[in-house]
């Protein structure tokens, strides 16, 4: 064969377009019809500095207000001293309010969007969005590579540990 000519037996796709086969995910990955995305949703509970307190991962076909209930139960066990929780409008509803009331003396406040048709920073919601952006900078969390939801939750925790360690080690 002449030099520079591809081998006829090599049927692979060119670099950059090659796809690896993935085994079937053991945990179900649903489809969120509202956002038109498949995969999983990550619910995070953060403090006022944006540091992770708790994380819960579930298939995307479960509504946000239903996915918040296990997160609230988990957080109540770990952090009984929390008094107030600020949440997105997706967590509005009786189920979430009842779950927050059942866990103790928590006050659940839904942060509403303003009626203006332009971008407005909502301070309480911005804390969580900023934390999710910090977490998504990690390669393993930029896309859904994992087969188990608990593995995704573990990588979210690791990403936050890495971020906090960098901040602690930073010289003033």
Residue ranges and their predicted role:
Residues 97-98, 103-105, 110, 117-172:
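Basic, amphipathic alpha-helical segments enriched in Lys/Arg and hydrophobic/aromatic residues
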Residues 1-105, 109-113:
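Polybasic low-complexity intrinsically disordered regions
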């Amino acid at each position: 064969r002449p030099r520079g000519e591809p081998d006829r037996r090599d049927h692979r796709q060119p670099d950059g377009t090659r796809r690896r086969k993935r085994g079937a995910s053991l945990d179900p990955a649903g489809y969120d019809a509202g956002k038109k995305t498949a995969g999983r949703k990550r619910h995070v509970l953060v403090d006022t500095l944006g540091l992770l307190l708790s994380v819960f991962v579930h298939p995307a076909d479960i509504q946000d207000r239903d996915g918040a209930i296990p997160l609230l139960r988990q957080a109540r066990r770990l952090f009984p001293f929390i008094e107030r929780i600020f949440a997105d409008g997706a967590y509005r509803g009786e189920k979430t309010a009842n779950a927050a009331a059942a866990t103790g003396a928590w006050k659940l406040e839904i942060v509403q969007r303003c009626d203006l048709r332009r971008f407005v920073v909502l301070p309480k919601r911005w804390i969580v969005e900023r934390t999710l952006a910090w977490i998504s900078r990690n390669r393993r969390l930029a896309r859904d590579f994992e087969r188990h939801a608990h593995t995704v939750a573990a990588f979210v925790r690791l990403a936050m540990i890495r971020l906090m360690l960098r901040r602690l080690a930073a010289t003033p």
